[in-house]
A protein has these predicted regions:
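Nucleotide-activated chemistry modules centered on ATP-dependent adenylation/adenylyltransferase
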Residues: 3-201
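Long C-terminal interaction/binding lobes of large macromolecular proteins
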Residues: 188, 206-209
Length: 210
């Protein structure tokens, strides 16, 4: 079920209820569109061969288990790691493609919350923007509005969020708003923690393991 031009999705759903459409009460999906009721890994494994590797705890440097292939996981992911324990949940901090290792940490680890990102493939939708400016951003579907400071440098947007935001991932789309007006968007190119690329922090922490 989709929003339509001037109608919000809630308004469309209300109309569907009034018309007794069968999809009126169908819950929203956050998965891949049009593949039906299939699990993400199951669907992707039809097109990407599995490539098992180790799951590494960034703090202890211990091997916690094995993954099916780093391409089946996303930064910030919690479910589906199959490495549960008494200490609490684990989250994906980084996917090291060269060594085929999945780097994880628990919720308290600061690197789970990057503090800035560069955005390329940009579209600026408002001509009179004065940078830097404070606005709101969304980095994934149905995410609550995130407060950011947006700047423009070397042909790219740079979003600063010193409070840290979980699960900002290279390749994701980023959309920026002033009040209810969409002012810009683009694709996350690189994520940073305290002005250094996150990948450099991770590679320094686990250099002997990768």
């Amino acid at each position: 079920m989709y929003k339509r031009q001037e109608l919000t999705k809630d308004q469309v759903r209300k109309i569907a209820l009034e018309q007794d459409f069968v999809v009126a009460k169908k819950k929203d999906s956050t998965g891949i569109c049009f593949i039906g009721e299939r699990h993400f890994k199951e669907f992707m494994s039809n097109y990407i061969p599995k490539n098992p590797g180790q799951i590494i705890d960034m703090e202890s440097k211990k091997v916690l288990g094995n993954h099916l292939g780093v391409m089946f996981y996303t930064l910030g992911q919690r479910k589906g790691l199959n490495i549960g324990g008494d200490r609490g949940p684990w989250f994906v901090v980084w996917k090291h493609l060269k060594s085929n290792k999945l780097i994880v940490a628990q919720d308290h680890h600061p690197l789970l919350k990057p503090t800035s990102a560069t955005i390329d493939r940009i579209n600026i939708l408002k001509d009179d923007l004065m940078f830097p400016l404070d606005c709101h951003a969304k980095f994934r579907y149905r995410q609550a509005d995130q407060s950011v400071t947006l700047d423009f440098k070397d042909g790219k947007l740079v979003a600063y969020f010193p409070q840290g935001i979980k699960a900002v991932t290279p390749g994701q789309e980023a959309v920026f708003y002033l009040n209810d007006l969409c002012i810009a968007g683009g694709q996350v190119e690189e994520i940073y923690f305290e002005s250094k690329p996150l990948r450099e922090w991770v590679e320094r922490e686990v250099k002997d393991e990768i």
